[in-house]
């Protein structure tokens, strides 16, 4: 049964490429302004910080505005792909896992400097999904994985979010009754969020890096409109697995991004001490 579903999904994905081959081509609407690269939406792809940075990371928080290039009136190949998963996998847990495996197995971790010649360069969900559909696999780093996963999950009928941790980015999917996650995650008191870390080639959906324990993290739920930033908290669950079963890659976020991010976290901790003490 599983093989039949995978075969059916493969045929459906191939259909996306045949019916609309242009969808498989990454956007070429880029222009340079000084040393920085911008897209047609006015978002800087080679910088995560600032009001026009792809993560809109400032001292006040962050907002992954690049994800909205693939939502609402801008839906394209990534949204269609997510809906294909929804049709082929009606059971929510299996659907969430198959979306995760698709990104984990087909996006090959590659640093931005090696692939694009920039310390940072973000791809939107349509560009990365299109490249995967066209070539069978495509290069990307942690924020590329997170953006694609979050858009696919939302298109497939889930609530999803992008989370920033020190030196890293990942996706979250809301699966309240999923019992295979290593840790139970909560966003501002709402439980049921599952960590989706796709840069490790052996990771399972819900695997959580032990090195993140005790680290402050924040998330933004995906929406066509700006959503409030939420603090991510977590607890050990009875299904915690050995940490040797998975991994992740650092380097997807530039050293400068890391420094700014940590300054922002420290600033956030000073602004909201009561929330930091909650368990």
Which stretches of residues belong to each language-model region?
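Secondary-structure boundary elements
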Residues: 55-137, 191
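Alpha-helical and coiled-coil interaction segments, frequently adjacent to or embedded
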Residues: 206-247, 251-252
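C-terminal membrane-proximal segments flanking the terminal transmembrane helix
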Residues: 130-131, 202, 276-277
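Linear, non-domain "peripheral" regions
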Residues: 2, 18-80, 265, 269-276
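Secretory targeting signatures
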Residues: 1-27, 171, 228-230, 239-279
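A short, highly charged nucleic-acid-interacting micro-segment common to nuclease
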Residues: 137-143
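Hydrophobic/aromatic-rich core segments of domains that either
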Residues: 143-226
